[in-house]
């Protein structure tokens, strides 16, 4: 069960013999979790909680060498998904391509930073399987962003997405939300869509490499601490059992990003299976 594998480190002072299981409760706290990836290979997720910035970063490498970075930024209500995809030069592709998808954060997706920073793992060598397999979140990214004319990009997005020259996307509804809330996120200059996209096919159904189409990019996070678990303490003086936070529930979650590309050959990863 979860209680034998994970605990929330208490900020109280403990006797010295307990401290071997604690990482210092400083600004940054890192957790490495071994997971089974969707292709069956064993991978390692690195989860990094930054209490000062109030964000959590999850990084892992897929079996094909793609490097995935997902940032959950609670302060700005932003989720950034970045994929660094290795190309196949023998097929005329670049050495690598960067995709960046910036959308509004769902606060029920992952536990808050303060609890993530206190999470400890007792058996780091074990391969983890999430307790709950959540479905796929389907995001239609209807706004492409011109990186070189993006105005003010706050540092985190700039650092992650500056190489996503032909693959930086967001959603109109999300930019409106950030604007309405006065959140300093991004000043976007959307790329013009010169084609009526209503009748476009998906890229796998498009035969001509130079035709525009809708591309999809899929990924799954195999292990996320998605909920806090509560236990009942012993009854106090008033005879009441008070609940306290004693661990986490883990989830896996999929994402599918759909977006317009002017040429099918800009979408080599979306093939019919």
Predicted regions and their residues:
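Signal-peptide-cleavage-adjacent N-terminal segments of secreted and extracellular proteins
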Residues: 1, 6-66
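Short linear motifs in intrinsically disordered/low-complexity regions
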Residues: 3-7, 18-19, 74, 107-110, ...
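A generic alpha-helix propensity feature with a strong bias for hydrophobic helices
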Residues: 14, 127, 193-195
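An acidic-aromatic
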Residues: 58-118
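Generic alpha-helical propensity signal that fires on short helical segments
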Residues: 76, 88-92, 97, 118-123, ...
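Short, surface-exposed linear patches
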Residues: 80-81, 123-126, 184
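A eukaryotic "domain-to-IDR transition" signal
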Residues: 96-148
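A eukaryote-biased signal for long
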Residues: 140-273
């Amino acid at each position: 069960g979860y209680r034998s594998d994970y605990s929330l480190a208490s900020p109280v002072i403990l006797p010295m013999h307990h401290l071997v299981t604690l990482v210092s409760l400083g600004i940054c706290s890192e957790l490495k979790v071994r997971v089974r990836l969707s292709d069956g290979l064993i991978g390692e997720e690195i989860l990094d909680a930054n209490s000062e910035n109030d964000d959590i970063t999850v990084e892992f490498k897929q079996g094909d060498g793609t490097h995935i970075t997902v940032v959950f930024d609670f302060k700005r209500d932003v989720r950034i998904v970045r994929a660094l995809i290795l190309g196949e030069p023998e097929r005329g592709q670049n050495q690598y391509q960067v995709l960046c998808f910036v959308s509004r954060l769902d606060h029920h997706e992952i536990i808050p930073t303060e609890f993530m920073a206190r999470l400890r793992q007792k058996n780091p060598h074990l391969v983890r399987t999430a307790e709950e397999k959540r479905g796929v979140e389907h995001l239609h990214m209807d706004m492409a962003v011109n990186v070189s004319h993006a105005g003010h990009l706050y540092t985190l997005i700039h650092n992650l997405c500056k190489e996503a020259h032909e693959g930086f996307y967001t959603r109109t509804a999300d930019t409106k939300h950030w604007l309405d809330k006065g959140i300093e996120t991004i000043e976007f200059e959307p790329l013009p869509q010169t084609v009526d996209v209503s009748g476009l096919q998906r890229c796998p159904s498009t035969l001509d490499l130079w035709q525009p189409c809708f591309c999809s990019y899929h990924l799954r996070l195999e292990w996320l601490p998605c909920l806090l678990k509560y236990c009942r303490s012993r009854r106090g003086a008033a005879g009441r059992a008070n609940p306290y936070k004693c661990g986490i529930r883990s989830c896996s979650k999929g994402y599918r990003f759909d977006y317009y590309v002017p040429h099918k050959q800009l979408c080599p990863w979306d093939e019919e299976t």
